[in-house]
Amino acid sequence: QSPGFPVTLLNIKTDDIWIRDYGPFFVKQGKRTIVSETQFNAWGAKFPPWKNDNQIPARIMKATGYGKGTSVPFIFEGGAIEVNGDGLGITTLDCLVGKNRNKPEDMSKIIKAICEMLGLKSLLILPHGLNGDHTDGHIDNVARFIAKDKVVIAWDKGMKSKNAQVLSEAKYLIETWLKAFYAKNAVVETLPLPPQRKLSDGQILPASYMNFIFVNGGLIYPKYKCKNDAVAQKFFEKAFPDRIVIGIDSRTVIEEGGSLHCMSKHESR
């Protein structure tokens, strides 16, 4: 416990920084918090080792004293799911089944297990995520809930962009799905992507403003030193007038394939 700050530091060994994906799911059962988990294998066995990462939920549960929740027996990462707190969730197909992930024939079991773990009544499965995302297309780079009936989605109008069609289809699917639950109150807004950079080896960096995080009284979003940073700042300030909005230069961290949301794990109140 840090003096003067409500922060407890846990010294736990990991294999990678992206705790969003291998960390615990903090689930509320009334006033009680439990720790649930899915299985993790470093995004389809792309980046070994992952032994330490896969043990993080159990170690955090022991350190916090929280109760034991569900252990889902399927490969699935925290960055692959976005929920609204009202029984709705969004994910992408490529993160559910695929090479070194889960078998297509287990799809119905996977959906049921995720919905039961998170208390979801509906899980929307988008076909794809951003081009170049080596997580197989996490939703936290594509679209996020900013209210129970409102979603913001990354946007690209470039005629030659591989993301343009993916995001246009995703927007249509989200709008149709959201209206089924919230009718005319359902809203899907767009926020332009920053320019998509490439490394010297040709690897595309899936930079996105969707990788923002909520903190107590604030919102922190990734910046990429481009003109769309100002657009993102204005959008978040308008969407969350009661929060302090801060942008952090994330050009270095995106070179490792993730950003702020990926390297953090929140515990809901």
PLM-predicted stretches and their roles:
Residues 1-269:
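The feature marks the mature, well-folded catalytic cores of soluble enzymes
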